[in-house]
């Protein structure tokens, strides 16, 4: 067997090679996704009165696409407008979303500060040994989510996704979120950063059209 296919090329970046088969994304049998509209497949449309309506279209979401490509079962717990606070304090419990999965992808942070005005805080708000003491900040609630998932499956692989840059004034905060999320990942076993801030295209007004 030629093991060179598993080796990184010189100066290779995470998104330089995107395989149509999704590569090793199919190594898991079941993945849970916790996110906002960017994970729920949310569509914007107009009703009969011309008012804008937002609808979660899970069958068009990227977890649904990955499920079709890889054969991995994706449980999508996302919803448009979701925040770490709402997911931890009400949404997951109300919908029975604290479920076992082999791996989890957490993609939150777009709404928490920029839309809802929740305080970001820092990883100093996270007590991995006693999460009930975490501060009610974005990072405090993110820490609670990771801790809760670890109680469900201690060996779960958890992938934390950072927000994309937007080419706007908030980019400074986005870079801060990414740097703190990297520290959060270091606090837990089998917890990894998917750094969209550093490697994904800028999610500016043109891209959002």
Regions found by a protein language model. Give the residues of each.
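N-terminal secretory targeting modules
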Residues: 1-58, 67-68, 97-100, 151-154
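Catalytic His-Asp segment of secreted/periplasmic serine-dependent ester chemistry enzymes
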Residues: 164-209
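Conserved SGNH/GDSL esterase-like catalytic core that processes O-acyl groups on lipids
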Residues: 30, 41-140
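Generic structural signal for well-ordered alpha-helices
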Residues: 142-146, 178
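Proline-centered flexible-loop/turn and helix-kink motifs
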Residues: 154-155, 189
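Active-site-proximal beta-strand/loop segments in catalytic clefts of secreted hydrolases
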Residues: 34-37, 77-82, 107-110, 161-165, ...
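Conserved, well-ordered alpha-helix/loop/beta-strand core segments that scaffold catalytic motifs
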Residues: 107-109, 159, 174, 190
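A generic structural signal for well-ordered alpha-helical segments
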Residues: 66-67, 149, 184-186
